[in-house]
Amino acid sequence: MNDLLKGSLEFSRDRSNRSDIESGHGPGNSGDLGLSGFFKKVQEIEKQYEKLDKHLNKLQGAHEETKAVTKAPAMKSIKQRMERDVDEVGRISRFIKGKIEELDRENLENRTKPGCGKGTGVDRTRTATTIAVKKKFKDKISEFQTLRQNIQQEYREVVERRVFTVTGQRADEEAIDRLIETGDSEQIFQKAIREQGRGQIMDTLAEIQERHDAVRDLEKKLLDLQQVFLDMAVLVDAQGEMLDNIENMVSSAVDHVQSGNNQLTKAVKSQKSSRKWMCIAILILLIIIIITVISVLKPWTQKNGA
């Protein structure tokens, strides 16, 4: 997607310059078409994507740490770090969403400028680039949703291992589901508590409870991003279809123009050929007329009579 967006930007600038030249304007006037400020805003969004990547890497690293944690205080510390990162991800995502909506509004406003109407090169450039930005944003948010699913799945696996380690038995799915949902692990560990004493199992109970709270809170925060994801998905699908229609119309227009050019070329060649044969016919006719006149007049007989 990085390559797609960069390619779109480079293609857009090149196309803009060519449009300026064809319309009799110099490259320096490209800012008048609204592309200069447009590209600056796209680059600003790109910088925010880099921040999202950093926070995603931090969250993935922290999640890996939780797999080896067996003490509640350590789990709580990691949870707090992850919550700060997720809060920052939410803030950045809302900022990006606002900037993308701003691009959409400005794209519509820019169509009122001369030479920037709907379907023009400038308009297609802005539309294609904006869609690329949206697709990238959707992909970024999708990565956080994948992380949420991984956390949820691996949380279950960790709980199953903890139960087996303490009790020596594998709990059924219903018991694990209940523990995951409520965080109350005493019931599942009742036999172990009676046999080993509450004191020896308290650390495990506290760690499971802390892990439960961490997963619940992180999942809620990450689910808040789901609405942003859905909003972007709807916009990308709708505008993607619109862009396809524009490109199809442009492609069709190009085909018609090319076909017209071919027909014109054939007509010119045919006209030249017709002129050539007409000249030959006229020349032959002149020769026939000259021969006929000479045959009638017979100038050589007049010379003999004299």
From Swiss-Prot:
Q: Which segments sit on the Cytoplasmic face?
A: 1-276
The topology of this chain with respect to the membrane is: Single-pass type IV membrane protein
Question: What's an example GO BP annotation here?
Answer: vesicle docking
Domain (t-SNARE coiled-coil homology) spans: 205-267
Function noted in UniProt: Vesicle trafficking protein that functions in the secretory pathway.
Spell out the InterPro entries in the cross-references: SNARE (IPR010989), Syntaxin (IPR045242), Syntaxin/epimorphin_CS (IPR006012), Syntaxin_N (IPR006011), T_SNARE_dom (IPR000727)
Quaternary assembly = Part of the t-SNARE complex.
According to the UniProt record, list the residues that bear N-acetylmethionine.
1
Instruction: Write out the GO cellular component annotations.
Output: endomembrane system; plasma membrane; SNARE complex
- Which protein, by its recorded name, is this? Putative syntaxin-131
What Gene Ontology molecular-function terms does this entry list? SNAP receptor activity; SNARE binding
Q: Name one Pfam family in it.
A: SNARE
State which residue ranges cross the membrane: 277-297
